[in-house]
Swiss-Prot record:
Pathway: Amino-acid biosynthesis; L-homocysteine biosynthesis; L-homocysteine from S-adenosyl-L-homocysteine: step 1/1. It comes from Granulibacter bethesdensis (strain ATCC BAA-1260 / CGDNIH1). It is an enzyme of class 3 (hydrolase). This is Adenosylhomocysteinase. The keyword NAD applies. Coiled coil: none annotated. It catalyses: S-adenosyl-L-homocysteine + H2O = L-homocysteine + adenosine. Pfam families: AdoHcyase, AdoHcyase_NAD. HAMAP family: AdoHcyase (MF_00563).
Length: 440
């Protein structure tokens, strides 16, 4: 594979596609700030006290415009940061340039090879003058696993890590269960203001955007198949239904399957759906959800894509045995021996970030406000507060704070409990309003 390594002076502590895109990136960063009230409120609240002073954060998360606002919030609160992307296709090159031009070390560009992907992550582990991280901010767990496998001695200085997504949290749980987690972790994904907003409402807007940008296909009237009906699957199914698709859902969990049926979706197996669908989206976080046999059964020019974190949900490697014809960046046709073609988006990686620009700024503000609060929580923790090394969640009052910071932007006004009402249901007038096990 021809290298996509950009030409950047070795003396500079960054590597991006084109630093000349920085002005464009800065303009979009400023626009995004207005749509990210949670992060901007944290800058206002904590900008003077600098609660992250002394924190050296290694970050591995999609290098988008929205992430640029997150990064600059972390630095505004006192942290130093080194950054890479957690996906080979998700970087927005003008966003990376904007951050690099601001003097923040970033190593990311769209279209990384696997070798370049890991090289970029490695650059966040060490920096000039002996810089090493004492905090980790991750999305998907690749940086976390690298640190545990290759640099376990560095983890002695790491106070904790925060993890953004479902897949990464599963990896953390497995490490903790095996007694191999070497630093405390906060599961940001399961904050209500992340999973019930980013995963659901974010996908509801960004999935169809990615498919349309990739294919220009008419969605209305198509039969769409969504594998998985968790929060991401729910948002994906709604996205496709809102575009006029007839949506089929596949599920392994009887509760999620019943939810899908009660929403009016037809619940089927992938074996049944393969020959019926015009468009397939995986959202399970699992492996081999769409197999080569499923793809052999699909219609000519069926569209196949994934909105889960990794590219393991579709058996892409099995398709490598056939001829690939690139149509444009992140859009390929795979030609079967009988002449049938399938349209594969982003090589089975995140379609909304590979073929489009991901979730809107507003919903990412909620997710990233959780990330900043998690970093503060871990960095400011009292000795032993987050021991043993385990996977924790943010306390309910912080989850509610994140939501409250976003209400004014959408014109929402809260009702306040009277003393009698608060006493009747046994809560404080200031919250938290629900117990930790409440299912929103």
């Amino acid at each position: 594979m021809e290298s996509s390594m950009p030409d950047t002076a070795v003396a500079e502590d960054y590597k991006v596609r084109d630093i000349g895109l920085a002005d464009w990136g800065r303009k979009e960063i400023r626009m995004a700030e207005d749509e990210m009230p949670g992060l901007m409120a944290l800058r206002e609240e904590y900008g003077n006290s600098k609660p992250l002073a002394g924190a050296r954060i290694a970050g591995c998360l999609h290098m988008t415009i929205q992430t640029a606002v997150l990064i600059e919030t972390l630095t505004a609160l006192g942290a130093t940061v080194r950054w890479s992307s957690c996906n080979i296709f998700s970087t927005q090159d003008h966003a990376a340039a904007g951050i690099a031009a601001a003097g923040i070390p970033v190593f990311a560009w769209k279209g990384l090879s696997e070798e370049e992907f890991w090289w970029c992550i490695e650059q966040t582990v060490r920096g000039p003058d002996g810089w090493t991280p004492n905090m980790i901010l991750d999305d998907g767990g690749d940086l976390t696993v690298l640190m545990h496998d290759k640099y376990p001695e560095m983890l002695k200085d790491v106070r904790g890590l925060s993890e953004e997504t479902t897949t990464g949290v599963h990896r953390l749980w497995e490490m903790a269960k095996a007694g191999k987690l070497l630093t405390p972790a906060i599961n940001v994904n399961d904050s209500v203001t992340k999973s019930k907003f980013d995963n659901l409402y974010g996908c509801r807007e960004s999935l169809v955007d990615g498919i349309r940008r990739g294919t220009d296909v008419m969605m209305a009237g198509k039969i769409a198949v969504v594998a998985g009906f968790g929060d991401v699957g729910k948002g994906s199914a709604a996205s496709l239904r809102n575009a006029g698709c007839r949506v089929l859902v596949t599920e392994i969990d009887p509760i999620c399957a019943l939810q899908a049926a009660m929403e009016g979706y037809e619940v089927v197996t992938m074996d049944e759906a393969a020959s019926r669908g015009d468009l397939f989206v995986t959202a399970t976080g699992n492996v081999d959800v769409i197999t080569i046999d499923h793809m052999r059964a699909m219609k000519n020019r069926a569209i196949v894509c994934n909105i889960g974190h990794f590219d393991s949900e579709i058996q892409i490697e099995s398709l490598r045995n056939y001829r690939w014809e690139n149509v444009k960046p992140q859009v390929d046709e795979v030609v079967f021996p009988d002449g049938k073609r399938l349209i594969i988006l982003s090589e089975g990686r995140l379609v909304n970030l590979g073929n489009a620009t991901g979730h809107p700024s507003f919903v990412m503000s909620a997710s990233f406000t959780n990330q900043v609060l998690a970093q503060i929580e871990l960095w400011q923790a009292k000795p032993g507060q987050y021991l043993p090394n385990h996977v924790y969640t943010l306390p309910k009052h912080l989850d509610e704070k994140v939501a409250a910071l976003h209400l004014a932007k959408v014109g929402a006004k809260l009702t306040k409990l009277s003393d009698k009402q608060a006493e009747y249901i046994g809560v404080s007038q200031a919250g938290p309003f629900k117990h930790d096990l409440y299912r929103y």
